[in-house]
């Protein structure tokens, strides 16, 4: 027995979808780095800390990038570092590459920021996002014509990004007309910029672990040194790993913690992807 439910309105399955409203591009070609000439390349998502990282070596120097989204500070943070001082040379820019949106980009050289603001074309949902660069050592110059920052001989670079919309889960308009997106974003960027990278990182870890550490699952196998893609291949070929099953369970918990904190439900199906 089955039932077919028809909801009022046309195109009932089209409930909208999540939209990206800002791409950050990092170009390391100034250092001579390509996909083919780096060594010891490794990517990792640490479920225990909620931090994604990329590491590699080039000309006997080790480079590392760490990424996380901090719920307490409401910012996305990327930190770039090297094993030797003055070895970071790259360019950074932010672009709007989404045909469903319209917006404009402003370049604030004095504050070392880049901001995109605009709206969704079909429903006028407003958005704003700002990227700010913070350097330890080295220098930063601005190519205003191409709207790109160029970093030279830096020891460490921290990129802070904040984003917000005027969405409000309140029928029937689903808009917060009182929200000043500029004030919200500027406050987040300014407050986060006053903290060191280690402070931002520690705040994020403590917040993440306050939720993640509530549940543990032990199926009797631990293979943390085996790459995940290898575990998946072995599982598909009949070498069943209980550790992979544990990992999948905890990964689902991580996605919920990272993506849905009560402000908006997680995407649970193909619709809206």
PLM segments and residue spans:
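Aromatic-residue-lined binding/catalytic grooves and analogous aromatic/hydrophobic interfacial grooves
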Residues: 1-273
């Amino acid at each position: 027995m089955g039932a077919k439910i028809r909801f009022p309105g046309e195109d009932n399955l089209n409930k909208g979808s999540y939209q990206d409203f800002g791409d950050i591009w990092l170009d390391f070609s100034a250092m001579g780095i390509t996909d083919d000439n780096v060594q010891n390349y490794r990517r990792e998502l640490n479920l225990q800390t909620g931090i994604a990282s990329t590491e590699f070596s080039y000309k006997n120097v080790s480079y590392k990038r760490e990424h996380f989204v901090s719920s307490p500070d409401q910012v996305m943070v990327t930190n770039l570092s090297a094993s030797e001082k003055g070895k970071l040379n790259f360019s950074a820019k932010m672009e709007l590459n989404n045909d469903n949106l319209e917006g404009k980009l402003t370049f604030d050289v004095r504050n070392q920021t880049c901001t995109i603001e605009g709206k969704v074309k079909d429903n006028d949902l407003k958005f704003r996002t700002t990227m700010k660069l913070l350097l330890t050592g080295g220098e930063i110059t601005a190519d205003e014509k191409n709207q790109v920052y160029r970093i030279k001989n830096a020891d460490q670079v921290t990129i802070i990004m904040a984003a917000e919309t005027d969405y409000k889960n309140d029928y029937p308009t689903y808009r917060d007309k009182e929200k000043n997106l500029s004030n919200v974003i500027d406050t987040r960027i300014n407050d986060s910029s006053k903290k060191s990278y280690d402070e931002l990182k520690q705040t994020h870890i403590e917040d993440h672990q306050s939720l993640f550490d509530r549940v543990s699952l032990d199926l009797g196998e631990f293979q943390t040194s085996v790459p995940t893609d290898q575990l998946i291949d072995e599982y598909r070929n009949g070498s069943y790993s209980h550790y992979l099953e544990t990992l999948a369970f905890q990964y689902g918990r991580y996605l919920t913690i990272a993506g849905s904190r009560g402000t908006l439900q997680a995407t649970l199906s193909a619709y809206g992807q």
